[in-house]
Amino acid sequence: MAQLTEHPAHSALVAHHERVRDLHMRDLFAADSGRFDKLSLRLGDILFDYSKNRVTDETLGLLFDLARQAGVEARRDAMFAGEKINRTENRAVLHVALRNRANRPILVDGHDVMPDVNKVLNQMRIFCGRVHSGQWKGYSGKAITDVVNIGIGGSDLGPQMASLALAQYAVPGITSHFVSNVDGAHMVETLQRVSPETTLFIIASKTFTTLETMANAHDARDWFLAQAGDEAAVAKHFVALSTNAEAVAAFGIDTANMFAFWDWVGGRYSLWSAIGLSIALAVGFDNFEAMLEGAFLADEHFRSAPLERNIPVVMGLLGIWYNNYFGAQTQAILPYDQHLTRFAAYFQQGDMESNGKSVTNDGRFVDYTTGPIIWGEPGTNGQHAFYQLIHQGRKLIPCDFLAAAITRTPLGRHQDMLLSNFFAQTEALMKGKTVDEARAELADKVLGEAQLELLSKAKSFTGNRPTNSFLYRVLDPKTLGTLIALYEHKIFVQGTIWDINSYDQMGVELGKVLAGTILKELENDAPVASHDCSTNGLVNYYKELRLGD
């Protein structure tokens, strides 16, 4: 396998960047009135406009050459075929099987996984039906009104993001809660809002040993039993998303209510699996299935569209262009939709845990930057917070803008106001405002020359800040599924070009091991001297503080 810098297209892109790095998008648009038509794609009713990027036809040609030289198509086909592309863990990567609505056989070690996938989906459908109909009763005979999902990482971020995104589809009478942090405040404050008689807890841990999740799960169980009394009642109020039947049964959960998933499902790609049970309970199983349909639409597009017309490929290549040739360190995801308030946070994990790597698939350290820092907030809030830096700062921050044409929560002219900002921001970031233009706007002001010079520069915008725009009819379950899957495949494309394994997460392990050691040291008040002087000092000061006055 070749590293990014070993491909002929890389050298060509370095030379090309030297020639075009000072080109301004204002001039590119002025020279080509058809730029939007040429540099936009559609999938269903989703419009992807990438015309406001610092690219020429030659740039794109070289980027597509890079994708072909890096083997994006072959590796994509290997993933869909169930090959073990996660080399460090010797696993297949098959979140795509979870939304394989064509039910095509997908083999792992000669075994078709689709019957297992369909079995769990049917189990989820039946369970959701029982809860939503009121047939599932708590220990006192009352129906379930609150669902508390206890998980962390992919077992929390995805379900929470999707449930918030689809809040307008919420099942009447069901309130969803999510607990992830081992900080006791998260669990305590959640339990204060629910009743043991009508609450269902979902424990999401594949191994049923995840430290934070199981600490919270046992606290929830203790709280429940303190009020319910009978341990047999646990089975009416707790279900598990796990594969460890022995531990699940020991906890008191009926293994008939254990929903399985597989080692070829990575945590940050798991909302399509049984991990999505909390989504299905929140918005209805039919809407969960619509998410799967939307993701399948993106999968089929990714599998079949030529690279030049392939949305995730274009997304990934543009990110490579800015990351590896312009030196951009971050990417902002800016949804102009309050329901997507956790979308950027979800892809912080999705992207940064996937591509925050420095070792290639054949064990060499890379000599180039890999995963970008992902961040963002919904518009228009961000405009009054951090857009100042995006517009006038010295950092290049490529941005993705997302918006729905129609809202399910109409209020006066709010949607037009929201979308006017959506359109204006991408135009402003592209065009900017020259010093001369700013000076002309100040012509009617009574200003001294020095003040006029100062304000003309302060009110100028360099522009040439790249953006992608996603515009779609409405944020419904299918559209949400498509958007998520497009970003998943973008991550895949970039990981392939960087020649890294996007599907392990070794970087989270060291801290967990050290935390286990320190936790034992916190069992007493004796000073520690087993670490570096900074860590010793912090631990010892904590011990002093917790003793109180």
Swiss-Prot record:
Signal peptide: none annotated. It is found in: Cytoplasm. The keyword Oxidoreductase does not apply. Keywords: Cytoplasm, Gluconeogenesis, Glycolysis, Isomerase. It catalyses: alpha-D-glucose 6-phosphate = beta-D-fructose 6-phosphate. One of its GO terms (cellular component) is cytosol. The active site is at E353, H384, K512. Pathway: Carbohydrate biosynthesis; gluconeogenesis; Carbohydrate degradation; glycolysis; D-glyceraldehyde 3-phosphate and glycerone phosphate from D-glucose: step 2/4. GO terms for molecular function: carbohydrate derivative binding; glucose-6-phosphate isomerase activity; monosaccharide binding. One of its GO terms (biological process) is gluconeogenesis. Catalyzes the reversible isomerization of glucose-6-phosphate to fructose-6-phosphate. Belongs to the GPI family. This is Glucose-6-phosphate isomerase. The lineage of its organism: Bacteria, Pseudomonadati, Thermodesulfobacteriota, Desulfovibrionia, Desulfovibrionales. The gene is pgi.
